[in-house]
């Protein structure tokens, strides 16, 4: 990498973009500083000197949000950054996906890409800057990489597509799309949307790709100028004799028939049996290099299984479980399984099963997101768990990993649009999807299960959502698109394209591929095939429960709203929160007050809510001129008495207004605690109230 500082500039969505090399992190294999508006990201790429054993490419992408980038000090006792937030993990996955397919086949060196956000401008996406930075750090390094790539954010506002919309524009956009790729094709898509059509989504993807081409050309100019020297990578050649023998043995032992079975475990056992028999033919304890031979045999076997699965799909149009390319596995749904949960749904598709459980909470139970942008209160959460038993395995039980965080977020994106607004449904909603069985498409099963749970809970959703995962097998110049892929098709195919939506349109998509990229024709066909599959699944779900239940669970908290004048908020809260805490302690409710004066009152019992409402009404109640009140004597002075019209509001009853005749002392007529009927006669500009008992006596006369 060049050690002399160079700066390259262009425009990106009408904002300045510059890439700097040669000044920072010079001991990394490659490093660039990306400046986009006021956003600054340092991206580095480093590779190990020696390859790792195994048949997996060890790529690690990190995205680090430094709180100083937004002028903030981290919360918590330690006051420093800790484990990455979910949003940072999702961004790291977003960058990983378009980059991973572009390393040479067989490359096994550890590669780590670290993106440090040093300055964050909310209107100049640090995430997209980090994606370009990752591509450039690899491109200017000596690491073999078949890039560059670029990514953009696409919005859809008033029928117009917008590149990298601002925070303000995102609030009114019907689409939040991240698309990435190289000059010739798209290779990553991630989106949340409000029921947009397949055509609108397709146009958005390729609108974004036009900008990607320009950004790739900009990067290529930098690469051509710097002329980085790349480490030559020569894939290890296989032993032709061993490969020929393994191929003959697997064919002889019936690999084709071993693959063709509906049951996942039976298929795995069939393939393992052939593997054991073939490996036994090569075992030689006296050969010191026998372990290497066995490893090569297993690698060849894996490739033969992959090739046979792909051949059957591409040539015979038959899938491992016997389905046609556009056929969905058997479906089964159930709701109301858990009596004490607020809502539950069990969704089964073939050998994939998800149990989604919903909990309703008060508005105060929202999740506070304190990242580099403004604080966000999230009142809808979807969490995804993938226990070991779901695939028949054992292992340690750990905190959610990147995959679980990613699948949970995808489900959240798919369902967020259908969650009713606060004014219509003043609750915090949390759904947990437990994957009980997995043979592919578990994230989409969790979306279907969550829709069932929402309707079972009585949440007035805008429309039910279903999700489906599409696959792809390319062979020579032909391709086959698969509906509802299972685990083997995901692992051995070329694409995992998840599409979720309602009857009217798409609410979320996510696309990962293992080939260089996809053409418009393939994506268009996949979207249409997904639409047909999605409608089939929706129809099945509606046979189980066709609309949200009319009432919430008896065990769900009750939440009611009331509105007060904003200037009365301080009266309800009281000095240092004294008054609101008194209300909570007395009634046992949860209170949430918005700046516009909306108050959410939550409790398990209606009487508790009613009592809290009464107290708040008394506090915020205003005296009216001409209104008559039964007032209580609170304080006596020489010039009159202060009476309480209602809790929190006193009035002055002047000594001259107590009786028709002249009195010398208030105590001659009234004492503390007495009740007297008074009429409000005046409220001055400072809110002070004057009252009269005499006016009522005159009226009686």
From Swiss-Prot:
Cofactor: Mg(2+)
Main localization category: cytoplasm
Catalytic activity: RNA(n+1) + phosphate = RNA(n) + a ribonucleoside 5'-diphosphate
Residue span(s) of domain KH: 557-616
GO cellular component: cytosol
An annotated Gene Ontology molecular function: 3'-5'-RNA exonuclease activity
Residue ranges of every copy of the S1 motif domain listed in the record: 626-694
Chain residues that bind Mg(2+): 490, 496
Enzyme class per UniProt: transferase
Family annotation (InterPro entries): ExoRNase_PH_dom1, ExoRNase_PH_dom2, ExoRNase_PH_dom2_sf, KH_dom, KH_dom_type_1, KH_dom_type_1_sf, NA-bd_OB-fold, PNPase
Keywords, alphabetical: Cytoplasm, Magnesium, Metal-binding, Nucleotidyltransferase, RNA-binding, Transferase
Coiled-coil intervals, chain numbering: none
Location relative to the cell: Cytoplasm
EC number: 2.7.7.8
GO terms classed as biological process: mRNA catabolic process; RNA processing
Gene3D superfamilies: GHMP Kinase, N-terminal domain, K Homology domain, type 1, Nucleic acid-binding proteins
Protein family according to the UniProt entry: Belongs to the polyribonucleotide nucleotidyltransferase family.
Protein task: Involved in mRNA degradation. Catalyzes the phosphorolysis of single-stranded polyribonucleotides processively in the 3'- to 5'-direction.
Protein name listed in UniProt: Polyribonucleotide nucleotidyltransferase
């Amino acid at each position: 990498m060049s050690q002399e500082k160079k700066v390259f500039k262009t425009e990106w969505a009408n904002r300045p973009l510059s890439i700097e090399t040669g000044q920072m992190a010079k001991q990394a294999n490659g490093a660039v500083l990306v400046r986009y508006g006021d956003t600054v990201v340092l991206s580095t790429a480093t590779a190990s000197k020696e390859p790792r054993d195994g048949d997996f490419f060890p790529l690690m992408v990190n995205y680090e949000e430094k709180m100083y980038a937004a002028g903030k000090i981290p919360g918590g006792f330690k006051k420093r950054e800790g484990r990455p937030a979910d949003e940072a993990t999702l961004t790291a996955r977003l960058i990983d996906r378009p980059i991973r397919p572009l390393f040479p086949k067989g490359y096994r060196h550890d590669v780590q890409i670290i993106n440090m956000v040093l300055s964050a401008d909310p209107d100049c996406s640090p995430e997209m800057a980090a994606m370009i930075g990752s591509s450039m750090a690899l491109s200017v390094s000596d690491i073999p990489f078949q890039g560059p790539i670029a990514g953009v954010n696409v919005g859809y506002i008033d029928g117009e597509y917008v590149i990298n919309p601002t925070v303000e524009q995102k609030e009114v956009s019907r689409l939040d799309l991240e698309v990435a790729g190289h000059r010739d094709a798209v290779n990553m898509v991630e989106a949340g949307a409000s029921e947009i059509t397949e055509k609108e989504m397709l146009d958005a993807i390729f609108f974004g790709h036009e900008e990607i081409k320009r950004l790739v050309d900009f990067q290529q100019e930098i690469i051509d100028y710097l002329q980085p020297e790349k480490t030559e990578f020569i894939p290890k050649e296989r032993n032709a004799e061993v490969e020929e023998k393994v191929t003959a043995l697997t064919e002889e032992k019936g690999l084709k028939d071993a693959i063709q079975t509906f049951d996942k475990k039976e298929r795995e056992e069939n393939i393992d049996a052939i593997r054991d028999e073939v490996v036994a033919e090569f075992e030689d304890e006296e050969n010191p290099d026998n372990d290497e031979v066995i490893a090569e045999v297993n690698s060849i076997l894996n490739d033969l299984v992959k090739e046979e699965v792909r051949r059957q799909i591409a040539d015979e149009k038959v899938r491992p479980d016997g389905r046609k390319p556009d056929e969905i596995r058997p479906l089964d749904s159930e709701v109301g399984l858990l009596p004490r949960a607020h809502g539950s749904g069990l969704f089964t598709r073939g050998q994939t099963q998800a149990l989604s459980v919903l909990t309703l909470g008060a508005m105060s139970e929202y999740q506070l997101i304190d990242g580099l942008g403004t604080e966000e209160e999230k009142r809808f959460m979807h969490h995804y768990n993938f226990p070991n038993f779901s695939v028949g395995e054992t292992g340690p039980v750990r905190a959610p990993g990147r995959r679980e965080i990613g699948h949970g977020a995808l489900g959240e994106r798919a369902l967020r649009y259908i969650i009713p607004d606060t004014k219509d449904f003043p609750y915090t909603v949390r759904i947990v999807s437990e994957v009980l069985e997995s043979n592919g498409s578990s994230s989409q099963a969790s979306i279907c299960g969550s829709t069932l749970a929402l309707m079972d809970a009585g949440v007035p959703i805008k429309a039910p959502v279903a999700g489906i995962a599409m696959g792809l097998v390319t062979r020579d110049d032909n391709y086959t698109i698969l509906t509802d892929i299972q685990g083997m098709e995901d692992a051995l195919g070329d694409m995992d394209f998840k599409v979720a939506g309602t009857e009217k349109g798409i609410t979320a998509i996510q696309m990962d591929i293992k080939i260089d990229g996809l053409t418009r024709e393939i994506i268009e066909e996949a979207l249409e095939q997904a639409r047909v599959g999605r409608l089939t699944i929706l129809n099945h779900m509606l046979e189980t429960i066709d609309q949200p239940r009319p009432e919430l669970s008896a065990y769900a908290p009750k939440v009611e709203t009331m509105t007060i004048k904003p200037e009365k908020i301080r009266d309800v809260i009281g000095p240092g929160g004294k008054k609101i805490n008194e209300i909570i302690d007395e009634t046992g409710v949860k209170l949430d007050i918005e700046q516009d004066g909306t108050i959410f009152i939550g409790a398990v019992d209606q009487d508790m809510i009613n009592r809290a409402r009464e107290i708040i009404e008394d506090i915020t109640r205003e005296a009216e001129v001409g209104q008559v009140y039964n007032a209580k004597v609170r304080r006596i002075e020489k010039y009159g008495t202060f009476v309480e019209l209602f809790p929190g509001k006193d009035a002055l009853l002047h000594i001259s207004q107590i009786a028709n005749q002249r009195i010398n002392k208030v105590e001659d007529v009234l004492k503390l605690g007495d009740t007297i009927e008074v009429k409000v006669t005046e409220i001055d500009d400072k809110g002070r109230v004057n009252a009269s008992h005499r006016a009522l006596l005159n009226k009686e006369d």
